[in-house]
Regions:
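N-terminal secretory signal peptides that target proteins for export/translocation
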Residues: 1-6
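Early extracytoplasmic/domain-onset interaction patches
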Residues: 27-74
Length: 626
């Protein structure tokens, strides 16, 4: 853990639709030492998606005698080697005096070579390109810029959070007159936006957002929170989202029973993309411009906010031992991402329901979606959940056209396992203990140093007063089917086809591209398509002599006879090929969960789980002024 700079409550904003260039400045603490590494970031080339960085590294910030700088290859929370150094160019030593220079020494490293005094600070300059709009990559434009620390800030190698926790960092934004929002500590008395971080972990874990943005504050749990709006807000209901985000925050705080941060920021990028990434005291989320106008999308946005905010406890503080301090130059693996992401994925929809922001029907629809996804993924029979977690770096974040058959998502199956674990604990304890109980105790017990996989399992067994090892082995370490039927009976839930007519229709067993739905992206193992030899990359031209429209084969397949054999014409490698397909019904038709109302109903258990049914708040009228 790094020691954070003291924050002044005087810098907390009141709710407002407009910002000054630097919204608040912390007052210097007499005990605070000046940061030793200084970055000056110039944003004059944002129109070309570039930032210019100059950095000064004191001699004392290096490890040993070698003067080597490195850039992370990944960012925490997103388990994929992204090789951010491919976006860095023009790295040069500014004070070599002609006797020394920077030499590329690894894909993400630069080393000072030549005659360079060991007591001299290292001053470098480089350019960073950013034009990929995701929550884990840099994106620079005049209208909106998102700076990701891992993709931007070179630091003395080797890059590990524990080695650099005693080093302070200062970031100066030169020439930036736009509003700026970040979890980094502002520095008072500077002519340009300037921020400090106590350690490299904090620097990397604090995205910087600037451009056309607005900040809106609310209180929850006696702590200030800020909803930052960025992007096209003309169709976005600020009043509704601010009110409901506050309710989500309060519900999650009540779940954990304590608040571990001083101020929390929700950076809401309204950009028609989707995604979220957790940080210690903030999150970056992306959503549709019209999400507040569409009920399903809005509930999804609330669940996304809940998911990332839940991570402020589960992942950022309660974590598997491997997930901190970080090694930023190589993969960090753990079998416990099912806890980090799967458990969080279970609670994101559930806590939105408990907050009264969704109905029981909407929640059961969301849980149905998790079950349908799992049961329509043949990979569940191939890859155990703990292995899916260990392989996150090469599987989930790098899917292939056969991933549906060989892989499983630790988000998806992890959420289902969390639901089943909650069920097991409630059943064993006769409702006196729940997964909520386990998570709160795990937070108290393991936040300081992290937990091992067997420690989390043992804690769950202890709290439930029942040996759960058999459940864990089946659900996590094998590919056996999960005990879903028993959970349905316990909760008094029906699991019926969403549409009996559709469930009885012919089934092909392939997935097509999002743009041109005639292009085959993947083929489900054992399906009629697979048995007939259809393959990823095929272009579907005709089925039973009828041309396949750009919307895909579904409009034809639904009229075909189950058990019938039909010709399917495809284009493969530039040649026409005909396959003979025998159509069946789907082995896992879309189903929906509904609470029983007669025999087998469990209304008391449902209420203890989902909370009392309530009318969701109406959408507030009015949007933020552009």
């Amino acid at each position: 853990m790094v020691v954070r700079y003291a924050r002044s409550l005087a810098c907390v904003l009141v709710a407002t639709a407009h910002l000054t260039a630097v919204p608040c400045l912390a007052q210097p603490d007499d005990a605070q030492t000046e940061p030793t590494v200084i970055y000056t970031v110039t944003a004059s080339e944002r129109a070309n998606h570039k930032l210019q960085v100059e950095a000064e590294f004191p001699a004392g910030s290096f490890f040993g005698g070698e003067r080597t700088l490195a850039l992370p290859v990944w960012t925490p929370g997103s388990y994929k080697v992204r090789d951010y150094s491919k976006f860095v160019s023009g790295v040069q030593l500014l004070n070599g005096g002609g006797a020394a220079r920077l030499e590329k020494s690894a894909k993400n490293r630069w080393t000072v070579v030549g005659d360079f005094p060991k007591d001299r600070p290292v001053r470098v300059a480089y350019t960073v390109y950013g034009h990929e709009l995701t929550v884990r990559t840099n994106f620079f434009t005049p209208e909106l810029s998102l700076l990701i620390g891992a993709a931007t800030f070179l630091a003395p190698a080797p890059l590990s959070g524990d080695r650099l926790e005693e080093t302070n960092f200062e970031v100066r934004l030169s020439g930036v007159t736009d509003p700026v929002s970040t979890g980094l500590e502002p520095v008072a008395g500077k002519s340009e936006p300037t921020f400090v971080a106590a350690g490299y972990d904090e620097l990397v874990d604090s995205p910087i957002l600037f451009g056309d943005i607005s900040e809106h504050s609310f209180q929850a749990g006696n702590k200030p929170h800020i909803l930052i709006q960025a992007g096209d807000r003309r169709y976005w209901s600020l009043a509704s989202s601010l009110r409901d985000a506050a309710k989500v925050v309060e519900t999650v705080q009540e779940f954990w029973g304590e608040v571990p941060y001083d101020t929390y920021r929700i950076m809401n990028l309204i950009t028609d993309t989707r995604g979220g990434l957790e940080h210690l005291d903030s999150t970056v989320v992306m959503t549709s411009r019209f999400a507040t106008e569409d009920r399903d999308k809005y509930v999804e946005w609330l669940a996304l906010i809940c998911h990332e905010f839940f991570h402020a406890w589960n992942v950022k503080r309660l974590r598997p031992v491997a997930l901190g301090p970080f090694d930023y130059e190589r993969e960090v693996t753990t079998p416990s991402l099912w806890v980090a992401e799967g458990v969080t994925s279970y609670y994101d929809d559930l806590l939105v329901r408990r907050a009264g922001l969704s109905t029981r029907t909407e929640y059961l629809k969301a849980l149905s979606g998790q079950l349908n996804t799992l049961l329509n993924t043949p990979g569940r029979k191939s890859l155990p959940l703990t292995e899916a977690s260990l392989d996150a770096w090469i599987r989930l974040y790098q899917p292939t056209d056969n991933s549906i058959n060989d892989d499983i998502s630790y988000y998806n199956k992890g959420a289902v396992v969390a639901w089943l674990l909650d069920t097991e604990i409630r059943q064993a304890s006769k409702g006196s203990k729940t997964l909520d109980t386990v998570m709160r105790q795990a937070y108290r017990q393991f936040s300081a140093g992290g937990f091992k996989e067997d420690e989390f399992r043992a804690l769950a067994s202890k709290i439930s007063e029942n040996d759960l090892e058999g459940f864990f082995e089946r659900a996590l370490d094998t590919t056996e089917e999960l005990p879903i039927d028993g959970a349905l009976e316990y909760w008094g839930l029906e699991w019926q086809p969403d549409d009996a007519k559709v469930a009885a229709q012919a089934y092909l067993g392939l997935n097509t591209a999002g743009g041109d739905a005639r292009l085959v992206e993947s083929v489900v193992a054992g399906s009629p398509a697979a048995l007939a030899g259809l393959a990823p990359g095929d272009e579907l031209l005709a089925i039973d002599g009828t041309r396949v429209p750009p919307t895909g084969p579904g409009s034809i397949v639904k009229f075909l006879e189950v058990g019938g054999r039909y010709p399917v014409l495809v284009s493969r490698l530039g040649r026409l090929t005909e396959c003979s397909v025998v159509f069946t019904t789907s082995p896992a038709p879309k189903r929906v969960l509904k609470a029983k109302t007669g025999k087998g109903a469990q209304p008391e258990r449902i209420e203890a789980w989902l909370g009392p049914e309530s009318k969701v708040p109406e959408k507030s009228k009015g949007v933020e002024a552009p």
